[in-house]
């Protein structure tokens, strides 16, 4: 089996290269929408199993990180027709950039995420690895993407405000988790909030995760915990293999 992934680089994403790893006996074919290539359209996406958007670096003023109405319609059509959307965020979330400006919030009808909070989770004792910002997850809800997974590490992670419908929490923070807000560097308790959710949109599927560094970090990335198996499960589920 070959999984075909297209990685968007045309919206100032932090993740500029999809991880190179072994997916058992299966193969990964990865192509890119380069920085100056866009805009995203349906014809560009339709032959791929998964569209990956890795941590858009939102700005208040610039246009390069925003999604146009036509791009949104193309992504909706792609997912609605059976495509997979894999969206990751990170510390700082959507930088409080509103939906009307074209931030990643515009994808909410597919992802179920209305807001990516502007800051970083600081986990409580026994729920982080080495540093409070390296979220250590040992309790995951049952789902095909968590099958066989006992431990996931998510560095530099934000959390979500989600819609009430058609979205399912897969990973949440501990009851004593804090959040460091980027706007003023204040830290306050947030309790149990979602940091990984899945959703289905017509014939397609979406996975949204509040961390991107778990895909690229040297010390707390794919080699940490069961992160490689977790990524493998995500790819297979988004491709309707599980």
Where are these regions (language model features)?
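Short C-terminal domain-edge/linker segments immediately following a structured domain
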Residues: 34-38, 82-86, 117-121, 236-242
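An acidic, glycine-rich "communication" segment
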Residues: 1-2, 10, 92-185
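Helical hinge/lid and interdomain linker segments adjacent to catalytic or ligand-binding clefts
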Residues: 3-6, 10, 14-105, 110
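Extracellular ligand-binding/catalytic regions of CAZymes and related secreted enzymes
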Residues: 1-9, 13-15, 35, 43, ...
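Short, Lys/Arg-enriched charge-dense amphipathic segments
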Residues: 17-20, 24, 37, 55-62, ...
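Conserved beta-strand segments of alpha/beta enzyme cores
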Residues: 29-31, 114, 168-169, 205
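Hydrophobic/aromatic beta-strand patches that form the interior of the parallel beta-sheet core
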Residues: 86, 170-173, 207-209
């Amino acid at each position: 089996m070959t999984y075909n992934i297209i990685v968007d680089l045309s919206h100032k994403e932090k993740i500029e290269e999809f991880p190179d790893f072994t997916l058992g006996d299966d193969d990964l074919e990865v192509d890119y929408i380069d920085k100056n290539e866009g805009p995203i359209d349906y014809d560009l996406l339709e032959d791929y199993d998964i569209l990956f958007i890795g941590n858009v670096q939102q700005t208040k003023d610039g246009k390069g990180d925003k999604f146009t109405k036509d791009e949104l319609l193309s992504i909706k059509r792609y997912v609605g027709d059976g495509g997979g959307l894999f969206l990751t965020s990170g510390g700082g979330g959507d930088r409080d950039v509103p939906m009307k400006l074209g931030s990643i919030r515009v994808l909410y009808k597919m992802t179920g995420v209305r807001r990516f909070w502007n800051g970083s989770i600081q986990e409580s004792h026994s729920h982080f690895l080495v540093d409070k910002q390296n979220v250590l997850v040992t309790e995951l809800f049952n789902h095909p993407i968590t099958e066989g997974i006992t431990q996931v590490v998510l560095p530099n992670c934000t959390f979500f405000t989600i819609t009430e419908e058609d979205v399912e929490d897969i990973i949440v923070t501990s009851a004593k988790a804090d959040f460091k807000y980027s706007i003023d560097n204040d830290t306050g308790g947030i309790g149990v909030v979602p940091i990984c959710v899945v959703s289905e949109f017509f014939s397609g599927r979406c996975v949204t995760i509040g961390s991107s560094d778990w895909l690229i970090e040297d010390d707390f990335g794919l080699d940490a915990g069961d992160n490689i198996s977790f990524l493998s499960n995500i790819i297979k589920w988004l491709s309707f293999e599980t």
